[in-house]
A protein has these predicted regions:
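Hot-dog-fold acyl-thioester-processing enzymes
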Residues: 2-111, 177-179
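HotDog/MaoC-like acyl-thioester-processing domains
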Residues: 1-27, 109-179
Length: 179
């Protein structure tokens, strides 16, 4: 049975979107803790021999445990596609970006800036809250007409410590007609 991963996209006006600025998502907690197996699988796939990913004793002394590669930050929060406790298919929660009411049916990521404040190590259980930071007035680009939407994701580990912040800017637009 295939799971429907489609989301309902919110439509509205720029003024509707401005009223959402400052809104935050419900906290979303990873299904599993950061694990050595996933750290090392990722490092193996990208051929990264950083000792902090492979040498448990070295990593424990330097970071408090095997260090999670920075590129895995958002990956820890991706839910498994199926769990034995599920009854039928469960629709994943749509991200805050999809719920911002704006015109436009197409997205492109314009910028992403991640700040790591504390090491993320094996055993950490991450929770993220997303906040709508800003929506630009309408912009005309070669891609089409739309709005830049900026969000801030704040990642915390199980003790409440903020470990990372991810500022993302996305351009939501209506594609320009082909020449």
């Amino acid at each position: 049975m295939e799971q429907d991963l489609s989301y309902q996209l919110a439509f509205g006006t720029y003024e509707d979107a401005l009223r959402m600025v400052g809104a935050t998502s419900e906290p979303r907690t990873a299904a599993t803790a950061v694990s050595a197996a996933r750290i090392q699988l990722f490092a193996a796939m990208v051929h990264d021999g950083n000792r902090s990913y492979w040498d448990a004793e070295y990593a424990r002394q330097r970071w408090g445990g095997l260090l999670a590669p920075p590129a895995l930050l958002m990956g820890w929060l991706i839910p498994p596609p199926w769990q034995p406790t599920q009854q039928g298919s469960v629709r994943p929660v749509a991200g805050l970006l999809l719920r911002v009411p704006l015109p436009g049916t197409t997205f492109i990521n314009a910028a992403n800036d991640v700040e790591f404040l504390e090491p993320i190590v094996e055993g950490d259980l991450l929770t993220v809250v997303e906040e709508l930071v800003s929506v630009s007035p309408e912009k005309r680009t070669r891609l089409g007409v739309g709005h830049f939407v900026q969000t801030l994701e704040t990642y915390r580990r199980q003790d409440g410590t903020v470990v990372a912040r991810n500022r993302n800017t996305l351009f939501r637009f209506t594609p320009a007609a082909a020449p």
